[in-house]
């Protein structure tokens, strides 16, 4: 866990990688989906999305738009791309994560015109409807528009998380050999019982986990996640979000939690030590995880028992007394 440690960053108005699920609407409904996306998936308004963009850090190296299926909410996607271009111009690389089912020649041309420079086809697995059946068609489509396929793998390393001066695409899916190592205990995967049962597997210490969400490591990019409006230190999300991107500046939220002992440990990718300041030893945490069979489920239990101050649903607005 101490591999490549450096001093934690202090400029939270700069984010190397921001992963934003702006919609959970999807044309598919996969058994492994971690956020319950589908034809009736949750959505937020264009007004809320514009507020979220306004509250993003002033500097973002790359911004990954995902879902759901972004192309299933195309009008909103286009509005988001236009606003992102107004705010960041060419200073930010815009990347789109899609299952590729709805991608056509006119849509691809529009996406490129609106500033998308990286396309990730994240559906090459047994869970998706087409499971890569369109891959050859998509390859021809990308080639016709000058989108290079030299960088097929997901961009997860610090030295390759950006691709300079070219359009590119890649493809991958929820397979056992992907960098995550299995399905998070979230959403449909949790309901269907196909989440990874391995108490030793630390989702937290790899990209898409919480490690480096506040900076401090130079082997993976510093990345945060926004699930609709919920600001999270990781893609699967903590039990309670660390902030609301509709009403709070992301930089302020990160600066606030950077002083908290729980989030310092999560930033180190070490969830089993996040309760030490409360008298919960690493040995106790690991023993609890053995029972729960998954580190994300241990994290959920810890937050439920010790982090209720972040639970936005517990606040009840009381009537004003006259």
Which ranges hold each PLM region?
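Conserved alpha-helical substructure of the radical SAM core
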Residues: 1-98, 102-114
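Short cysteine clusters
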Residues: 26, 30-33, 234-235, 293-299
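Secreted/processed peptides and extracellular or luminal domains of membrane proteins
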Residues: 32, 36-39, 135, 241, ...
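Short acidic, glycine/proline-enriched helix-loop-strand junctions
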Residues: 85, 89-99, 127-163
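Non-cysteine beta-strand/loop elements that form the S-adenosyl-L-methionine
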Residues: 111, 116-127
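C-terminal accessory region of radical SAM enzymes
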Residues: 147-205, 236-291
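Auxiliary Fe-S-binding modules of radical SAM enzymes
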Residues: 210-231, 247-322
């Amino acid at each position: 866990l101490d591999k490549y440690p450096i001093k934690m960053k202090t400029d939270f108005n700069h984010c190397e990688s921001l992963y934003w699920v702006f919609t959970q609407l999807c044309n598919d409904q996969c058994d492994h989906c971690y956020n319950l996306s589908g034809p009736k998936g949750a959505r937020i308004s264009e007004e809320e999305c514009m507020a979220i963009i306004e509250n993003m850090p002033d500097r973002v190296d790359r911004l990954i738009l995902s879902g759901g299926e972004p192309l299933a909410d195309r009008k909103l996607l286009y509005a988001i791309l236009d606003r992102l271009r107004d705010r960041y111009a060419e200073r930010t690389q815009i990347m789109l994560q899609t299952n590729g089912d709805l991608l056509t020649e006119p849509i691809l041309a529009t996406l490129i015109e609106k500033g998308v420079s990286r396309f990730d086809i994240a559906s090459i697995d047994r869970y998706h409807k087409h499971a890569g059946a369109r891959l050859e068609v998509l390859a021809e489509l990308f080639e016709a528009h000058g989108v290079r396929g030299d960088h097929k793998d997901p961009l997860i390393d610090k030295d390759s998380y950006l691709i300079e001066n070219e359009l590119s695409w890649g493809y991958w899916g929820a397979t056992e050999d992907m960098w995550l190592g299995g399905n998070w205990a979230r959403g449909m995967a949790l309901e269907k019982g196909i989440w990874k049962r391995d108490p030793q597997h630390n989702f937290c210490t790899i990209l898409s986990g919480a490690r480096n969400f506040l900076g401090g490591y130079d082997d993976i990019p510093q990345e945060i996640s926004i699930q609709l409006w919920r600001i999270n230190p990781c893609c699967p999300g903590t039990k309670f979000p660390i902030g609301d991107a509709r009403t709070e500046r992301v930089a302020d939220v990160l600066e606030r939690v950077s002083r908290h002992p729980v989030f310092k440990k999560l930033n180190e990718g070490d969830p089993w030590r996040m309760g030490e300041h409360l008298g919960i030893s690493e040995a106790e945490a690991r023993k609890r995880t053995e029972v729960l069979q998954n580190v994300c489920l241990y994290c959920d239990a810890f937050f439920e028992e010790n982090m209720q101050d972040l639970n936005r649903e517990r606040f009840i607005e009381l009537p004003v007394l006259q």
